[in-house]
A protein has these predicted regions:
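Bacterial Sec-dependent N-terminal signal peptides
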Residues: 1-60, 538
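Beta-strand-rich domains and repeat architectures in extracellular enzymes and scaffolds
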Residues: 64-102
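Repeated scaffold domains used in trafficking and secretory/extracellular systems
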Residues: 69-77, 122-131, 168-179, 215-224, ...
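Short beta-strand elements that form the blades of beta-propeller/WD-repeat-like
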Residues: 83-96, 134-144, 180-190, 197, ...
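Beta-propeller blade signature
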Residues: 101-109, 151-157, 198-201, 245-256, ...
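Blade-loop segments of beta-propeller domains
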Residues: 112-148, 161-174, 260-270, 423-427
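Conserved blade-ending motifs and adjacent loop-strand segments that build the rim/top face
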Residues: 262-273, 318-335, 345, 350-353, ...
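Loop/turn-rich, solvent-exposed surfaces of beta-rich toroidal or solenoidal domains
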Residues: 359-379, 384-385, 389-390, 403-404, ...
Length: 538
C-alpha cells in the first residue's frame, strides 16, 4: 500500500502522543526515556521520507569505433541537441591521392545510426576551421601557397555534401570562420593587420568589411546573428598611450556597417571580451571580462547594453566583490585572502586579483542567464637553436594549458548579478585552449561536469549553494570484465535535457580472457544525470 507522507506523519504523531500518555502514568523517568526514543524515531522517519536533493551520473548507451592503426585518425563530435549527434572520423594518409578523408555518421539520441557520408580533399589544401548551424556543417580548406579555398557543406538532415571552391582575397592567416546564409565570413590577418572578409557562395566574390583593417588592433571574436542577419565583430585596440578599448561593430548581410559601439578605457579599466545576448531588435546585453589598463589578465566581470549605436553605462564587478569567488581555495588560504580584502577596505583601497580567464557562451535557463568562465594559464617549453644558443629564435612556446578553477554566475534578464559560485579544476590540463566545464539545467539546479584523465567529474549547485560536492565517475567500457589500459583526448559536452556526451580514445583489455587481444577504440557514451526520484529517462 502506498500512502502519502502527510498521512504517515500524522499516524506517527498520534501514536507518539498515546505513548507519552502511557509512560506519564508510570513516572517521570519513563516519560523521559519514551520521549528520547520517539524523538529518535521521528528523526529517522523524516530522514527516510524527505526527498533527497542528490543525483548521480550514469552511463546508458555506448558506441565504439575501431581505430585503424595504419592511418592517422582523429575523432570529432558535434552534438546537435535533440536532433542527435554527428561523428566525424578524420583520416589523413599523405601517400594517397586524396590525403584527407572525412567520414561522417549521424546518430539519433539513442545513438542509432541515421546516415553516413564522406568527402575527400586532394593535395594542396589543408583543413583550417569548421562551423555548424542548425542546417549545415561547414569545413574550410585552404591552399597555403595561394588564395584558393574550398568549403565543404554537409546537410545535417540528409547527409548530402557539396563543395564550393573559390578564392579569398586579402586574408593570409585565418583565425575565425562563420557562415551566414550563403556567405562565408573569414577573420584573420593580412600583412600583420586584422581583416574580415565575406565570400559569396553564389558568385564567388570577396568583400572586405570596412573599418577593421588598421594597425594596433586585434580581432577578439566573430559572431553571426541568424535572426537579425548580421555579422558581429569584436575588436580591441592596442594603443598603450591613448589606452586600449573594445569595439563592437555590426554589419548587414551585404557587408554594410550598421552600428558601432566603442568602450574606451574607464578609470584605467578596459574591456577584454564580450558575449552578446539579444534582448530586442538591435538591442543586446553584453557581458564579459575586463582588465586594468591594457593587460590580458582579467580582474572582474562587466555588464552593459547596446542599442543601435547607443552604448549604456558599464557595471564593473571585481572578483574580490563576489561572495563566493574564492570558494575554490582551501579554507586556510581563503581566510587569508578574505583578511587581505578586509585590510584593504579599512585602508580605503581596493583589493585586485588578476586571472587569465576563458569566458563561455551564455546558457539560458527559464529564470536567468548563466555565465561560465575558467581560469587558466599557458604552459611553455623552451625551444633552443642548437647552432646558435644565443639566437632570438630561442623562444618559449605554448605547450598546453592548465585550468585552476571555474567561475559560474547567474544574471537576471536586465544583467543584474544574482549569485556567483566557484569550484576547483585541480590543474586540469589540455593541449588546446577551449571550454571544459559543461552545465546542464535540471530541476532548478545546475549540474557542472568536466573530463579529466579519462574520468568525469561532477558537482551539483543551486545558485551560490553547493548541493552535492565533487564526485568522480568512470567512463565504463562496453563489456564487463574489461580494463582500460590507456585513455586519451577525453571530451565532454552537455547534450540535451539531463544528458551529456562523453567521447575519446581508449585502449582496452579483457581481465577474464588473457588470450583476447587488446583493442583500441574511439568511444561515444551517452551519460544521464539521475533525477531525485531515482529514475533516469532514456
Amino acid at each position: 500500500m502506498i500512502v502519502g507522507f502527510n498521512t504517515l506523519f500524522c499516524e506517527f504523531v498520534r501514536s507518539y502522543n498515546n505513548l507519552c500518555l502511557i509512560f506519564f502514568t508510570l513516572g517521570q523517568e519513563s516519560l523521559t526515556y519514551a520521549m528520547k526514543k520517539t524523538n529518535y524515531l521521528l528523526f529517522l522517519l523524516l530522514w527516510i521520507t524527505v526527498p533527497k536533493a542528490f543525483g548521480q551520473l550514469e552511463q546508458s548507451i555506448r558506441v565504439e569505433f575501431a581505430k585503424d592503426a595504419k592511418d592517422e585518425e582523429e575523432l570529432d563530435v558535434t552534438p546537435l541537441e535533440s536532433e542527435g549527434v554527428l561523428v566525424t572520423v578524420k583520416k589523413i594518409d599523405y601517400f594517397a591521392s586524396s590525403p584527407f578523408v572525412w567520414k561522417f555518421t549521424k546518430y539519433d539520441t539513442q545513438l542509432k545510426e541515421k546516415w553516413k557520408a564522406e568527402f575527400k580533399v586532394g593535395f594542396g589544401k589543408n583543413p583550417l576551421l569548421s562551423y555548424h548551424n542548425k542546417q549545415y556543417l561547414f569545413w574550410l580548406f585552404g591552399d597555403p601557397d595561394s588564395d584558393d579555398i574550398s568549403i565543404h557543406r554537409l546537410d545535417l538532415s540528409t547527409g548530402e555534401t557539396e563543395e564550393i571552391e573559390g578564392q579569398i582575397l586579402g586574408v593570409e592567416v585565418v583565425s575565425h570562420f562563420k557562415v551566414l546564409g550563403n556567405t562565408a565570413i573569414l577573420a584573420g590577418k593580412y600583412r600583420e593587420k586584422p581583416v574580415v572578409a565575406m565570400f559569396s557562395f553564389f558568385d564567388k566574390s570577396t568583400k572586405v568589411l570596412p573599418a577593421i583593417y588598421t594597425s594596433n588592433m586585434e580581432i577578439v571574436d566573430l559572431e553571426v546573428d541568424d535572426e537579425a542577419q548580421q555579422v558581429i565583430v569584436f575588436s580591441r585596440s592596442l594603443k598603450l598611450k591613448t589606452g586600449c578599448q573594445l569595439t563592437i561593430r555590426r554589419y548587414a548581410y551585404d557587408g554594410k556597417l550598421l552600428f558601432t559601439n566603442a568602450f574606451p578605457a574607464n578609470e584605467d579599466r578596459t574591456l577584454l571580451t564580450g558575449k552578446l545576448m539579444p534582448i530586442h531588435p538591435n538591442e543586446y546585453l553584453v557581458i564579459g571580462s575586463y582588465a586594468a589598463s591594457c593587460s590580458s589578465y582579467s580582474q572582474g566581470i562587466y555588464v552593459t547594453k547596446v542599442k543601435g549605436d547607443e552604448s549604456f553605462p558599464v557595471k564593473y564587478i571585481e572578483f574580490s566583490e563576489m561572495a563566493n569567488f574564492f570558494n575554490y581555495m582551501k579554507p586556510k588560504r581563503q581566510q587569508k585572502i578574505q583578511e587581505k580584502i578586509a585590510r584593504k577596505k579599512e585602508e580605503g583601497k581596493e583589493a585586485h586579483f588578476r586571472y587569465m580567464i576563458l569566458v563561455h557562451d551564455f546558457v539560458k535557463t527559464p529564470d536567468e542567464l548563466v555565465l561560465v568562465a575558467e581560469s587558466f594559464y599557458p604552459q611553455y617549453h623552451n625551444t633552443v637553436n642548437v647552432v646558435n644558443p644565443l639566437s632570438r629564435s630561442n623562444a618559449d612556446r605554448v605547450n598546453g594549458f592548465k585550468y585552476t578553477h571555474a567561475l559560474i554566475c547567474g544574471f537576471d534578464k536586465d544583467g543584474n548579478l544574482r549569485w556567483d559560485n566557484s569550484f576547483p579544476l585541480q590543474d586540469l590540463e589540455t593541449n588546446q585552449l577551449g571550454p571544459q566545464v559543461q552545465i546542464s539545467y535540471q530541476q532548478n539546479r545546475l549540474v557542472l561536469a568536466y573530463p579529466k584523465e579519462g574520468k568525469i567529474n561532477t558537482q551539483l549547485i543551486s545558485g551560490s549553494k553547493v548541493v552535492k560536492e565533487k564526485e568522480e565517475f568512470e567512463v565504463k567500457t562496453t563489456y564487463e570484465n574489461e580494463k582500460i589500459l590507456f585513455a586519451d583526448n577525453a571530451s565532454l559536452a552537455a547534450w540535451y535535457d539531463q544528458y551529456f556526451l562523453a567521447w575519446g580514445f581508449q585502449k582496452i583489455e579483457s581481465t577474464k580472457d588473457k588470450n583476447t587481444s587488446q583493442r583500441e577504440v574511439f568511444y561515444l557514451n551517452k551519460l544521464t544525470y539521475k533525477s531525485n526520484d531515482g529514475r533516469a529517462k532514456l
